[in-house]
Amino acid sequence: MDNLFGRLLTRQELGDDFEHLPANTVTFPGMTLTNKCAICNRCGTSSLLQTVKLEIAAYFCPECLQLGRVRSDELLYHLPQQIFSPQDTLLWNGQLTPYQAEVSRALITAIDQKSQILVHAVTGAGKTEMIYAAVSSIISSGGTVGIATPRTDVARELHTRLSRDFSIPISLLHAESEPYFPTPLVISTTHQLLRFRHAFVLLIIDEVDAFPFADNDALYFAAEQSRKMTSTLIYLTATSTDKLDKLVKRGQLEKVSLSRRFHGNPLVVPKVIFSSSEKLIYHLIKKQRETGFPLLIFAPVIAFGRLFSERLRSLFPDESIGFVASTSKDRADEIERFRQGQLTILISTTILERGVTFPKVDVFVIQSHHRLFTKSSLIQIAGRVGRSPERPTGLVYFFSCGLN
């Protein structure tokens, strides 16, 4: 029963716990009906009645269907969030740079003021370490913290890092994760926020510009609904969005910026190579492999990436080559093998464009003119290089047939 506190769940999600719900359980209709629309009370989406009508004279929400169907003739169930015992949990004893410390202090001020704040920092600035003091301050006062990110791989990476740097068990939630358990610190994909209501004193959205969170009204609704009425919201990004920039200009959102990496070295500038010659690409890969540094290669689509990886295996039989995409069942294992040096070359779609760190890596982008490689995406991809103080430089090659 403890795993229900702070949650917003359907009857199906409750399972056997439904028979033992306490008296203080709060219920909501799954949808609110108007003359023309059905409004989902889990994700806030409004749909025209005629487009979402079921044969049983009820309505459903298509927007959050992947989390289980919400219907107008069924209820949503909520138990108010529990209070946790105050505890000191921060194990990290590293030192922030003066610029990082300034951002960290701004986050503490935002917590004191129960306000919203945007942290706009370059890739490799050390955003994760900058939130530690804020997270620790909430947990040490008995509060709850949620850290959400649009991408599953980023959520896994954050969970690994914070599990190392905090002494409490951390619940990790995504489509393939273990079930939720009660804890003051939750790391999840942004879709999982739809299953929380008034749960977090502090909510942090990392990589706020990434798909599927960016410009997704349902996920912004989830971010608002998942945190307590009086709480703090922190947005983290290296590439802000028009929506957030407008809020900053209107004075509705505070913004702090950090334009340098934690090790003080400048960002690595990509080199654009206007050529589609496979011979040139293979030549530069061969030259890069002579350095011994790991090579991360981005492909625009899954089919091309898979074929390209097979071609590289035939051309470079002495290299250990992997391929990952959103459909890869062994994705987490392959990423870890690359991080540990068991793979020397990793080909990936844009799933690894952000939120992951591979020390001393070089990056090649094939068909960088492809429409899926947006400005934001290419900035994030280039930011994978030079993140390690042991090697703050590196290669970033954009192979392109022209500017898009």
Show which residues each predicted segment covers.
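Conserved RecA-like helicase motor core of SF1/SF2 enzymes
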Residues: 207-210, 335, 339-392, 400-403
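Post-DEXD/H (motif II) to motif III coupling segment of the RecA-like Helicase ATP-binding lobe
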Residues: 198-272
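Interdomain "pre-motor" coupling segment immediately N-terminal to P-loop NTPase/helicase cores
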Residues: 33-83
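Conserved segment of the helicase C-terminal RecA-like domain
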Residues: 228-243, 382-404
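Conserved helicase motor
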Residues: 149-157, 161, 170-181, 188-195, ...
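N-terminal pre-P-loop "Q-motif" helix
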Residues: 92-115
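Conserved strand-helix element at the start of the C-terminal RecA-like helicase core
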Residues: 119-128, 138, 143-158, 285-313
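Hydrophobic positions on the alpha1 helix immediately C-terminal to the Walker A/P-loop
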Residues: 130-134
